[in-house]
Amino acid sequence: MTKRNIKVYLKDKTAIIFSMMTQIIILGLYLLFLKQNYVDSMTSMLDGFNIKTEDNLINALVNSWLVSGVIGTSVVTVAMNSLSVMISDKQNKIDYDYNASSVKGSTVVLSYFSGAVINTIVISAILLTAGIAFSCISGSSFPEFTELLKLYGLVILGSVSAVLILMFVASFFKKNSTYAAFNTLISVAIGFVIGAYIPVSQFSDGVQTFVNLIPGSHIAAMIRNVLVSPCINDISTSLAGADHGMFAVEAEKAFATNLNLFGNEVDFTFMMMYSIGAILLFLVLNLISYKFSSKRKD
């Protein structure tokens, strides 16, 4: 059944295109004006310290931020579109056929979950691999083995988290039309929420706290932390202490490698625990939702 759900999603070219729509928008905005804006911003920051660095290092930093935004949004949008299979089955009454058969309801639900997770991991991992290659070509150093493990591990963590959260939300939808409208809304908003269009640090403290309560923001920030921090360190090393370490401090704030919650900065460890907590919470909520839906069918 998991294989069937994966095939249904992959055969729907429209769903795949919509899965990538946010990433296409991010790339378009980046190429049109975002990249130059942030390159100019970093250059101005260095000019403020009366020092210069190589342009390729600044390009690598900004490109790494782009890649983190693409991956941070992909784990959400791919998960959301993968779960459209579940909504289609409801609308077409295929779930009634499952209920009439010997297949357990829990098996059906698990197949939707596993299919969506596999789709999300595979597509996001492909995008991450392409993103790392792009960053290296632009001048970024190739990630160390431990950093690669972190990045692909975060893709898995983000995929599981996104599917669990969106699966709970999707359980309240019965028609493709309403789910498609919700899908469009989230696809547009997620780029702002995780700081893919504009770094979250540009928002007020209140807005930062609001968007940073969303688990996807923590996944994106951890990916950003792993990808962007080495680039910041490369630039700091090239400055040889001429900035007294201030560039790294300002750049980390500007690109939000850590998040702001209720006026307090939270680090990688907190974000990891928060993400795991969200997974456990929505696992429980999905189990409760499944029990209630099973009782209604009985």
Annotate each language-model stretch with its function.
Residues G105, A116-I194, L283:
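Alpha-helical transmembrane segments and their short interhelical loops
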Residues R4, V8-S44, V62-V78, V117-S124, ...:
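Hydrophobic alpha-helical transmembrane segments of multi-pass membrane transport/permease proteins
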Residues S238-D298:
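Junction motif at the cytosolic side of a transmembrane helix
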Residues L29-N37, A170-C231:
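Transmembrane helix segments
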Residues M1-K11, K291-D298:
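Transmembrane alpha-helical segments of polytopic membrane transport and secretion proteins
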Residues I25, N59-I137:
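Hydrophobic alpha-helical transmembrane segments of multi-pass membrane transport proteins
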Residues R4-V8, N92, Y96-A100, K174, ...:
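Short amphipathic alpha-helical coupling elements at transmembrane boundaries
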Residues S41-N59:
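Perimembrane loop-to-helix junctions flanking transmembrane segments
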